[in-house]
């Protein structure tokens, strides 16, 4: 998943 995502 994208960085900073849960």
From Swiss-Prot:
UniProt subcellular location: Secreted
Biological process, per Gene Ontology: defense response to bacterium
Q: List the disulfide bonds.
A: none
For this record, the Gene Ontology CC terms, alphabetical, are: extracellular region
Q: Which domain of life is it from?
A: Eukaryota
Q: Keywords in UniProt for this one?
A: Antibiotic, Antimicrobial, Secreted
Its biological purpose is as follows: Has antibacterial activity against the Gram-positive bacterium B.flexus and the Gram-negative bacteria E.coli and V.harveyi along with two other Vibrio species.
Protein name, UniProt field: Antimicrobial protein 2
